[in-house]
Amino acid sequence: MQIAVYSGSFDPLHIGHLAVLAYLNGRFDKVLLVVSPQNPFKGAEKAANATARLSAAREAVERHPELARVEVCDIEFQMSAPQYTFRTLDALQALYPSDTLTLVIGG
């Protein structure tokens, strides 16, 4: 299976992110929208509540049936800080050992 991994703070998740997700949805078997609880390179005091951002991402994906292959992923909420991308990819590869992961950046 081909899996796109689209991670970020999504603070907030906006129409540009949704456009990227729609593009990926048509090109991959699965798209993981990985919401990061805390970007290690940004100050926590400026970020919206992590749980609220995760919930908002889930609600946004649910409102868009054209994003049927998109799954909001909370794996970084289960990991110890700091959540660096390479650690997240290692954890995801352990969950999907026979699949190909593609990291998507930007939006």
Residue ranges and their predicted role:
Residues M1-G107:
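Nucleotidyltransferase catalytic core that binds NTPs
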